[in-house]
Amino acid sequence: MNMFSSLMLASLSVLTLPIMSSILNTHKNSTYPHHVKNIISYAFITSLVPTMMFIHSGQETIISNWHWMTIQTLKLSLSFKLDYFSMIFVPVALFVTWSIMEFSLWYMHSDPYITRFFKYLLTFLITMMILVTANNLFQLFIGWEGVGIMSFLLIGWWYGRTDANTAALQAILYNRIGDIGFIMAMAWFLFNTNTWDLQQIFMLDPNLTNLPLLGLLLAATGKSAQFGLHPWLPSAMEGPTPVSALLHSSTMVVAGVFLLIRFHPLMENNKTIQSLTLCLGAITTLFTAICALTQNDIKKIIAFSTSSQLGLMIVTIGINQPYLAFLHICTHAFFKAMLFMCSGSIIHSLNDEQDIRKMGGLFNAMPFTTTSLIIGSLALTGMPFLTGFYSKDLIIETANTSYTNAWALLMTLIATSLTAVYSTRIIFFALLGQPRFLPLTTINENNPFLINSIKRLLIGSIFAGFFISNNIYPTTIPEMTMPIYMKLTALTVTILGFTLALELSLITHNLKLEHPTNMFKFSNLLGYYPTIMHRLPPLANLSMSQKSASLLLDSIWLENILPKSISQFQMKTSILISTQKGQIKLYFLSFLITLTLSMLLFNLHE
Amino acid sequence: MSLAHINIFLAFTVSLVGLLMYRSHLMSSLLCLEGMMLSLFVMATMVVLNTHFTLASMMPIILLVFAACERALGLSLLVMVSNTYGVDHVQNLNLLQC
């Protein structure tokens, strides 16, 4: 009798302890944030044990705890699915969250509501764990909505700022549109497979799964910011940097991809949906990489980088490689969170300056942050044998050697090289050159919280890929043999991107600033997508509904059709055809004479 | 024709001439129009009663009703003209405006 299920449940339930303590009002004291951070580190260590047991034995578990209700033939219960995906994701997520909590002890140090902040982050983590370990769609939906709500509360943390409120509302609205797809999928599964349990759905293996998979794809588009529902992710950078690091890089936005990965037994039989996901992911990754090229806010560039990597994950699902996508989720969490934390360190040191045109020369002033930023960027672009290499290179290789859409593949490769371009841009503007910030600096990165948290993620960014890849059991076999030019494709385009970006930056650094070209404006304004879609459809909708509701019935049918139209018609025609001048007496007199004459004529004719 | 008939007929003709030939006021032609209606009414009643044509005894009543409507219409036109100009002189009606 091993302690697999007990330890996993213990690890998940210790996370809820600090929330319970708010009932006892112990959360008002100032050590509450440290308390939360320690709880998460304990949960992480506790969850390592079941994970290592799982790696050793390959034993998957389903824990069905509590039967909630039965509605006619649908049985709803609290069940946790501890399989490959959730067992590996939970320690990774807990590790990253531990580092982010420690980072936010430094970052949010001067915030008066820091305990509330930590409570929100913890609630977010709990709902994310619910999402990841859910065995039925209902529990998954609870986690799904939970992360959406916490995202709203955390993006709008500084609610005095209008932009933050707008961004939080935008996140909710775009996620809601995705939720329509989710609910449609739930309804379809309820009707056709009579259940919301994943096991029964996969066992029944329904034939025509186009509709539910389209619904799940829409849900993933909304939650993971794919093209069409993507503008909320760059706007979500209005929240504090720990929020961006946790939610919008590692954990929440991968929920959509995670959903599609969960349903991979259904997706591998449906070629149409695979092509759709492939094209959607390819468009997303290229579009957001283009948008990232000319942004000036460091957090927005990293947000677009996240969006581009999410598109890459969706592409991986589209070529029927869910395990590779999952590996990329896990490795991406490390270096993306670290990139955000480094940008947070830079921002705080430069007194809340987020514009990269006003940074520079930090290479010597902040060595530790510089190191981790460069290593994070190298890991992101897939530098051989760092973390990103183990997932990203495998993805590109598999895409190259599989029977897939050449256009999608080309877009993915271009986006890979653009990844290197904008990473170089960040490094060049923020770290190299002469300082462009104000002389009175407050650059200080000597806080142990900051250093320890970034150091942990740094070690993770370097070694986690190797560590995870060597310890998971074999799933889909990657392609082992390919021509050498295909093997080196990812590396080549990345080095090409680096070189190009560096050369361009160095050459144009001292040139005169020109008027922005059309391409520049397209990239800077996010492809005009938010400008058009946030103004035109709401205006059209609202004006159409106003016209049909008030104008159509009242003023047209009741007023205009008969009464006013008749009066106007009469007036117009009478003006048109009247030739009289109002000489009434003349008309009457002529009438009388005619009458008299005709009577005389007819009477005296005999 | 008998003398009564000629009398009524003459009344009708006088009113007709008065309707068609008037000097300046629109009211006078409206009055003559009423006179025409009245003489027609009397003529119709006399004929119906003399020939005992009972079935047609509705006709004068209906004629009166329609005369009332027409009276109202004529008076409303008069009021419109009078609203614009203050007096109902016919020479004012040379501007056909809508």
From Swiss-Prot, chain B:
Gene3D superfamilies: 1.10.287.3510
Record GO biological process: ATP synthesis coupled electron transport
Domain of life: Eukaryota
Listed Pfam families: Oxidored_q2
Topology term for the membrane: Multi-pass membrane protein
Keyword annotations from UniProtKB, A to Z: Electron transport, Membrane, Mitochondrion, Mitochondrion inner membrane, NAD, Respiratory chain, Translocase, Transmembrane, Transmembrane helix, Transport, Ubiquinone
Transmembrane regions listed in the UniProt entry: 1-21, 25-45, 59-81
Enzyme class, spelled out: translocase
Catalysis: reaction(s): a ubiquinone + NADH + 5 H(+)(in) = a ubiquinol + NAD(+) + 4 H(+)(out)
Subunit details: Core subunit of respiratory chain NADH dehydrogenase (Complex I) which is composed of 45 different subunits.
Function: Core subunit of the mitochondrial membrane respiratory chain NADH dehydrogenase (Complex I) which catalyzes electron transfer from NADH through the respiratory chain, using ubiquinone as an electron acceptor. Part of the enzyme membrane arm which is embedded in the lipid bilayer and involved in proton translocation.
Protein name: NADH-ubiquinone oxidoreductase chain 4L
Native source species: Equus asinus (Donkey)
